[in-house]
């Protein structure tokens, strides 16, 4: 999943978005060799120890999109994985938008749909429904305008893998930290048993 997400990130996101707190050589942590990193993921860097930066500068980004494309190094920590997954799945065509695209969870987003060739093009109709108490709920009706190269299941998997990779980029040591945490808790549990036994031994004459 992480390798698939890294490939999607390099092919579709790294054209505009930096991940400047992440170095290419850290991708060895997810099972990629240096040769695989060089051949498949490094399009704007010469050395495997460089950070993931793009040639697009903030000034050009603001001119093209209205705002500079944000760095994605910690986007999963600031937005959450669930939000990113929903965001990637809810783009739709909007002729009123400057880019021709809009998003259901991020209205008037400046970013066009980078994965549209995979998901295809869709339209969205938001239908409000009011109950007897006057509470209004919204129904989102999606319609396919043009199919993409992936079906719904495949695209959802692509979005999931990309989000997993962004979570990894936000904290590359996260997996090892969790493993270390489990070991530490296990050791503390053993120490607690010995400490409790020692306490009973010290206090048995008093009780």
Predicted regions located by residue number:
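Sec-exported extracytoplasmic/periplasmic mature domains
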Residues: 7-10, 14-21, 77, 89-93, ...
